[in-house]
Amino acid sequence: MNLKAVILNCNQYEDSDELVYMVFAIKLNDKFESHSEAIVLRLTFEEMEMNLKDIQNSKCPGFEYFLEMNLIQDLYEDIRLLEEYKSDDEKVKRIIYYAEFDS
């Protein structure tokens, strides 16, 4: 799955009292791209307390932390109706920008 697909389908994931979804992706030329390979991990709260590097090394070697799914969902909802982010590509680029520079 690529990062664009994960972002555009973010509402398919719902955290629970026991599980949280977190997105990891592969950087291309030192940055995330819409076509970067991505993985959505379902983590327990106990796993969430682990160091991010430990999660990466044990569950998705070669991938880097992108964002927690609930944050992607909040961002997507915030920009969904804004005029400047009409296309899916613009929405995806904005969320990637946030992950790299604002989070």
Per-range role (PLM):
Residues 1-55:
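Extended, charge-biased low-complexity segments
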Residues 39-100:
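Amphipathic protein-protein interaction modules
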